[in-house]
């Protein structure tokens, strides 16, 4: 468990992550224009929401990685964890560390995404600000000893944003701008 000081910690703003989320929200505005709409794009959005949130985050990051709720063949585990990384809620190692910290100190000062401080923090703040105690490499390592040596998870940790751009280009090639707008931005 991180040792928290009584002094309010100095948070570091992550311009890259914040810029990425601004880019996503600005891109989402294109959904209001007819040239960025297709029913196949809507179907893609619904499918990706299920795949990234339900399978990737809930099943992969949460049940499988955080709580070790099951044993899976390596290729299945890697597939669902990859799907979780596409949700853009951080890479698997940091997400798991933060969630384990959350369970260790739910809604206290030891919770990295407690709603007690603000409505903003648990929804996006914890991802765009680096907290000196929760995001310290040694603390992350301490909470993720069972997964942090996995090379594939390390790759996803470093590249989950880049993977969005690769997926965006694939969607552009297959379904045009509507697939990018509805498959990436929304």
Regions found by a protein language model. Name each.
Residues 1-186:
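Non-catalytic, topology-defining segments of multipass membrane proteins
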């Amino acid at each position: 468990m991180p040792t928290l000081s009584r002094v309010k910690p100095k948070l570091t703003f992550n311009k890259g992550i914040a810029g990425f989320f601004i880019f996503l929200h600005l891109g989402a505005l294109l959904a209001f224009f007819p040239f960025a709409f297709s029913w196949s794009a809507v179907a893609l959005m619904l499918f990706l929401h299920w795949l990234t949130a339900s399978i990737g985050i809930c099943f992969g990051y949460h049940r499988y990685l955080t709580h070790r709720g099951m044993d899976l063949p390596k290729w299945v585990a890697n597939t669902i964890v990859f799907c979780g990384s596409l949700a853009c809620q951080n890479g698997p190692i940091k997400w798991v560390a933060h969630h384990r910290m959350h369970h260790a100190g739910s809604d206290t000062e030891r919770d990295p995404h407690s709603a007690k401080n603000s409505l903003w923090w648990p929804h996006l703040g914890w991802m765009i600000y680096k907290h000196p105690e929760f995001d310290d490499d040694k603390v992350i390592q301490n909470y993720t000893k069972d997964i942090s040596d996995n090379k594939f998870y390390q790759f996803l940790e470093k590249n989950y944003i880049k993977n969005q751009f690769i997926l965006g280009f694939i969607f552009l090639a297959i379904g045009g701008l509507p697939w990018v707008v509805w498959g990436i931005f929304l």
